[in-house]
Amino acid sequence: MLLRWRSQAKRSQLQKKNVYYSYTESFYGPDIASAYYILSLKGGFRYVGQSEWFRANQRGKFSWDFLNHKNTPIEEADMSYTIINYTGLENLERQRSLRTLKLKGCPEVDDWFLARLHLFQDSLEELDISHCPRITTGGLAALRNLKGLKHLNVSSLPGISNPGLVIILLEEMLPQCQITANGYDHNLRKVEEEEEEQMQRQR
């Protein structure tokens, strides 16, 4: 009973944190609403044309100076280790100048989330989805829509099978993109040996 209550409470908090910030958007516009959402999840961001980053501290506290930049789109967002999910991504949908999105270690980022990133196909240049436990090989196929991507980090994804082959497929899908893939055994010879052994068994 206690475990079920804790699970429901956790799920409720996740939904609450990722709710669409329509009220904030109606008063301050989409850029401020996106900024507030990022900070509320203890993330950080940088506006277009600005060098300063706005970040929440470990306690979730942040400066309200970001309100002084109404109608200024976000260029970089760091949501690493936050609980952003597919639903919450709606709060960033109107950020069509977003060039960098860091999602390292996000426990709720999954294949559905990756499929929705096509919204940023005209602007996104750098994407970090390393250490995300819910991403699978099938989800990575959706990244083919991000034709402008220049840097992609897919390091240490536990849900990826045959990482060596997956990296090759990613390089074929995104030939202009530099792919970082640490934390895997890239020994393709081992894969070839396993395939050859399987063929011999079938004979």
What does each model-identified segment do?
Residues 10-27, 32-115:
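LRR N-terminal entry segment and analogous cap-like coil->beta motifs
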Residues 2-20, 24-30, 41, 74, ...:
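Long, contiguous C-terminal flanking segments immediately downstream of a protein's structured core
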Residues 19, 77-84, 97, 103-109, ...:
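Concave beta-strand-loop units of leucine-rich repeat
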Residues 84-88, 93, 109-113, 135-141, ...:
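The leucine-rich repeat
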